[in-house]
């Protein structure tokens, strides 16, 4: 579906931005590209539909090398849709309807089909009824949804979203991830970039790690976040669940790293040994007990302690 071969790119001042990137994303996959700010994630994504042209290497879409001719770029941009990190870079029409209709209208589609695509796209992102609102009056999360709808209206096969949850509160960010998961279930290939490790386990099937313009690792979320040294080298942090279990493991507890709260709860419940209740409280101390309550929720935390005490 998408393949990058030895892709390199430098900024106009000569500073290297991407160095020899090799990456392959299959049809229908959910992929995350993670790395710290300045790792090259946004620059990488701008190569996926021809906004940027590599200094060296190739971009291959559906087995065909992108040749950057005008006709080729039009075709690629119908197939690969990019949602920018800042929705204000993408929303410029007086109303939501006009913004979402912009792409289909430029394809020369009949008016009734344009209206159908607008209605369908807004419904998918939960923004039906906002057609006549001004985009600049919307909240950050609403703007992000409208920006996604504008790309959906083009009916792309591949959705590429640069930092889709940046600047959003947790509830709004979770809503964006739910939209992307639903699009994946419909068969759309979805790629996101992020330096927020917490959303990766909710979303990704495969993770690529970028640092200083180089691809330094690839694997499942669990494979990536089990490697605490890799995460340190990439100037990231472990998800809270993985960090807790990794700290417990380093303290001598026989636990395996998990990513979800439910898996973490059961790992603590079933794998801690007979004197685990007292060992756990001693290890945590008051401050870390509060962190564990925040992580698991108060009910599950007390269920866990009760179960350990009964062992």
Curated annotation (Swiss-Prot):
PROSITE patterns (alphabetical): ABC_TRANSPORTER_1, ABC_TRANSPORTER_2, CBIO
Residue positions binding ATP: 35-42
InterPro entries the UniProt entry points to: AAA+_ATPase, ABC_transporter-like_ATP-bd, ABC_transporter-like_CS, ABC_transpr_CbiO/EcfA_su, Co_trans_ATP-bd, ECF_ABC_transporter_ATP-bd, P-loop_NTPase
Keywords: ATP-binding, Cell membrane, Membrane, Nucleotide-binding, Translocase, Transport
Protein name: Energy-coupling factor transporter ATP-binding protein EcfA
Record's function text: ATP-binding (A) component of a common energy-coupling factor (ECF) ABC-transporter complex. Unlike classic ABC transporters this ECF transporter provides the energy necessary to transport a number of different substrates.
NCBIfam families: cbiO
Major site of localization recorded for this protein: membrane
A Pfam family per the record: ABC_tran
Subunit structure: Forms a stable energy-coupling factor (ECF) transporter complex composed of 2 membrane-embedded substrate-binding proteins (S component), 2 ATP-binding proteins (A component) and 2 transmembrane proteins (T component).
Family annotation (SMART domains): AAA (SM00382)
PANTHER family (alphabetical): ENERGY-COUPLING FACTOR TRANSPORTER ATP-BINDING PROTEIN ECFA1, HEAVY METAL TRANSPORTER
EC assignment: 7.-.-.-
GO molecular-function terms, A-Z: ATP binding; ATP hydrolysis activity; ATPase-coupled transmembrane transporter activity
